[in-house]
Swiss-Prot record:
Primary location: secreted
Tissue: Expressed by the venom gland.
Keyword Iron: no
InterPro entries from the UniProt entry: Kunitz_BPTI, Kunitz_BPTI_sf, Prtase_inh_Kunz-CS, TFPI/VKTCI-like
Limits of the BPTI/Kunitz inhibitor domain: 31-81
Compartment(s) of residence: Secreted
PANTHER family assigned to the protein according to its UniProt record, in alphabetical order: KUNITZ-TYPE PROTEASE INHIBITOR-RELATED, SERINE PEPTIDASE INHIBITOR, KUNITZ TYPE, 3
Gene Ontology molecular functions: serine-type endopeptidase inhibitor activity
Function: Serine protease inhibitor that has activity against chymotrypsin (Ki=4.77 nM) but not against trypsin.
Signal peptide coordinates: 1-24
Name of the protein this chain belongs to: Kunitz-type serine protease inhibitor B1
Length: 84
């Protein structure tokens, strides 16, 4: 296969991976953790996946500790955990 064909295949696979919805079986376990603002006093706009509503929601992160269910953007939350 030519290098152009390989690039096209790679591009199509990447697009497919981005557009394929995440099922509950593929979702990382930390997506089911509750929002945890942590113990520090920073005021950082963050997002977490709410497994009950199946949506990425905004919360304020304090800047330290907390858990892995926090994302810098709604898009990153959706890419990792799915949701709306």
């Amino acid at each position: 296969m030519s290098s152009g064909g390989l690039l096209l295949l790679l591009g199509l696979l990447t697009l497919w991976a981005e557009l394929t919805p995440i099922s509950g079986h593929d979702r990382p376990k930390f997506c089911y953790l509750p929002a945890d603002p942590g113990e520090c006093l920073a005021h950082m706009r963050s997002f977490y996946y709410d497994s009950e509503s199946k949506k990425c929601k905004e919360f304020i992160y304090g800047g330290c500790h907390g858990n892995a269910n926090k994302f810098p953007s709604r898009d990153k939350c959706r890419q990792t955990c799915g949701g709306k």
